[in-house]
């Protein structure tokens, strides 16, 4: 795994399920609760938190409607953050707060209770450490240009990398523009133009 090879913190407590026979082994290795998600889906589609073998088998069946490969990870207790990366620079982190069991599809697109905190409420040392980790993780898997890195902070205070989002939303209410605005770039100045094989920033003159 590129993250492990690059000596960045990585959640080792992860397995890939390809058949119901894998569920028992994964549950024995990782324990409950678990989070189940299709390997190649976005927007938390097909994701579920499970607390028993019966729920795990049902979640696998549901997730396989979206992808033949399904990831199962040990549940991490703690706050979730996301860090936008733009042109080799980590932007201010955003803390994601939801009353739901996790930051699921409903929390992202339908709920009025989800909170996005930017600044995220971290002290300066933790904020800089999180940004550095996110940028390192982004580059370790060969990403360039722009994206987002999702991270959780576990009950011991350690950062746990979740994933890189290589196609984050770019609407006026999406998280990358939110972080850019906190960093001093308004929505009219954050314009991405494709060139030289990657996404790069281009300035815009407001008229």
Protein language model features and the residues they cover:
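Short small-residue beta-strand/loop micro-motif enriched in glycine and branched aliphatics
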Residues: 44, 114-117, 171-176
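ATP-dependent carboxylate activation and anion-phosphoryl transfer catalytic cores
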Residues: 8, 123-199, 207
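Phosphate-binding site of ATP-dependent enzymes
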Residues: 51-132, 158-160
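Short, flexible turn/loop "capping" segments at secondary-structure junctions
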Residues: 38-40, 109-111, 172
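Active-site nucleotide/adenylate-binding loops and adjacent lid/helix of ATP-dependent enzymes
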Residues: 1-79
């Amino acid at each position: 795994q590129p993250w492990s090879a690059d000596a960045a913190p990585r959640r080792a407590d992860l397995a890939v399920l390809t058949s119901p026979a894998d569920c028992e082994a994964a549950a024995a290795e990782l324990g409950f609760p678990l989070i189940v998600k299709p390997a190649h889906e976005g927007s938390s589609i097909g994701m579920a938190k499970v607390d028993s073998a019966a729920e795990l088998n049902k979640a696998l069946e549901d997730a396989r409607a979206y992808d033949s490969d399904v990831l199962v990870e040990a549940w991490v207790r703690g706050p979730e953050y996301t860090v936008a990366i733009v042109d080799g620079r980590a932007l201010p982190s955003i803390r994601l707060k939801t009353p739901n069991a996790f930051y699921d599809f409903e929390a992202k697109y339908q709920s009025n209770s989800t909170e996005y905190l930017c600044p995220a409420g971290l002290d300066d040392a933790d904020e800089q450490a999180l940004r550095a980790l996110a940028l390192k993780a982004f580059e370790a898997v060969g990403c360039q240009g722009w994206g987002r890195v999702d991270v959780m902070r576990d009950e011991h205070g350690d950062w746990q990398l979740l994933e890189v989002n290589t196609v984050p939303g770019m609407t006026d209410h999406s998280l990358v523009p939110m972080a850019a605005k906190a960093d001093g770039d308004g929505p009219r100045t954050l314009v991405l133009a494709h060139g030289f094989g990657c996404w790069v920033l281009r300035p815009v003159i407001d008229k």
